[in-house]
């Protein structure tokens, strides 16, 4: 370990910043946010420094570097564009045993500034030891995406509750189990973010009074159409908090690699015409695991409320009184069409879009007359095995023979493949495609020739 990571208490303590340009301005913001009593020494100052000085937030000393300013300092930053000046500052601090950061010169500095994720009072610092600031920044961005914005409010509220929790729960084990439930309670976090004090108090009271082995909860999460980059931030947060993840065939390996490492995984692979695990059994798995007190994530491809049977699964939980929530996902129609260069609506071609299941229960029938109407786009989910029937019915009800169609296989994935033609070819085209696949019918398919961006990447 080349550097010891520490957090400094600078509130009301003298700090010196040497430099008055844009880099120095960024450092000044950090020091002011930390509550430092800041003096800035430079030949010239960017306008923002004058604003801060007029507001009494810092003191400006114009001129050459003045070593006497170090006499009362706890910490110094050298942020000029003159290497010689920066070196003088560093040397002077070394003699006085004052920690000094030299911007863009980690070898001359006695401390370095990390990339910061600020969820005060929770702080996360990321550093490459000065060897690769860009890498540290990229890691910080990933952590920013994972950590909810309201996490600081939750941490502050936890601090207010510590004494009460200690008197409520007698043992360390009980207190630990309480805090584990507390920090993953979405209802509490959302109430704090919304400043809904009544909801905060009600949720807190329930957490403090219910048995620690109380039933868990189920979160229904839409994984999106395949590309892991299309998973929502909230979806990512949920799969990284799960005790158990119940997932199906449409969830990509890339997304499963993001799941919390020690979470149990239950595969309930499903596809049109074949169910590895019957739907009722899936419902019972969710119920059984939640009743054990676990945080269960039901991870489904696309959006769970669009042909995902999410409603059926939640009805079972609702009837049993198990708490649940839903995180929407990007549905396959949206993701696959975007990655295929096919806009679902267009002023010249389609004023509406219809999402249709091609996998119907026995005896079900679609309104083919309205589906064959002009100026709309049809997207058939799970329609591959019914492609010939879809072709026949649409033609029978008046759709034009030359209506463009596209079949998108493995949409949004690196292995995505798009086969296109006209309606009279749909049944034959389907024989060239493997599941999972989506069928798009409409004049908007013609735009693919110009708008197909993904295959060029």
From Swiss-Prot:
Recorded catalytic activity of this chain's protein: uroporphyrinogen III + 2 S-adenosyl-L-methionine = precorrin-2 + 2 S-adenosyl-L-homocysteine + H(+); precorrin-2 + NAD(+) = sirohydrochlorin + NADH + 2 H(+); siroheme + 2 H(+) = sirohydrochlorin + Fe(2+)
Region (Uroporphyrinogen-III C-methyltransferase): 216-457
InterPro entries assigned: 4pyrrol_Mease (IPR000878), 4pyrrol_Methylase_sf (IPR035996), 4pyrrole_Mease_sub1 (IPR014777), 4pyrrole_Mease_sub2 (IPR014776), CobA/CysG_C (IPR006366), NAD(P)-bd_dom_sf (IPR036291), Siro_Cobalamin_biosynth (IPR050161), Sirohaem_synt_dimer_dom_sf (IPR037115)
GO molecular function: NAD binding; precorrin-2 dehydrogenase activity; sirohydrochlorin ferrochelatase activity; uroporphyrin-III C-methyltransferase activity
UniProt pathway: Cofactor biosynthesis; adenosylcobalamin biosynthesis; precorrin-2 from uroporphyrinogen III: step 1/1; Cofactor biosynthesis; adenosylcobalamin biosynthesis; sirohydrochlorin from precorrin-2: step 1/1; Porphyrin-containing compound metabolism; siroheme biosynthesis; precorrin-2 from uroporphyrinogen III: step 1/1; Porphyrin-containing compound metabolism; siroheme biosynthesis; siroheme from sirohydrochlorin: step 1/1
Alphabetically ordered keywords of this record: Cobalamin biosynthesis, Lyase, Methyltransferase, Multifunctional enzyme, NAD, Oxidoreductase, Phosphoprotein, Porphyrin biosynthesis, S-adenosyl-L-methionine, Transferase
Residue segments, region Precorrin-2 dehydrogenase /sirohydrochlorin ferrochelatase: 1-204
Positions of NAD(+) binding: 22-23, 43-44
Disulfide bond positions: none
Modified residues (Phosphoserine): 128
Enzyme Commission identifier(s): 2.1.1.107, 1.3.1.76, 4.99.1.4
Binding site for S-adenosyl-L-methionine: 225, 301-303, 306, 331-332, 382, 411
Family indicated by similarity: In the N-terminal section; belongs to the precorrin-2 dehydrogenase / sirohydrochlorin ferrochelatase family. In the C-terminal section; belongs to the precorrin methyltransferase family.
Its job: Then it catalyzes the NAD-dependent ring dehydrogenation of precorrin-2 to yield sirohydrochlorin. Finally, it catalyzes the ferrochelation of sirohydrochlorin to yield siroheme.
Name of the molecule in the record: Siroheme synthase
Organism: Enterobacter sp. (strain 638)
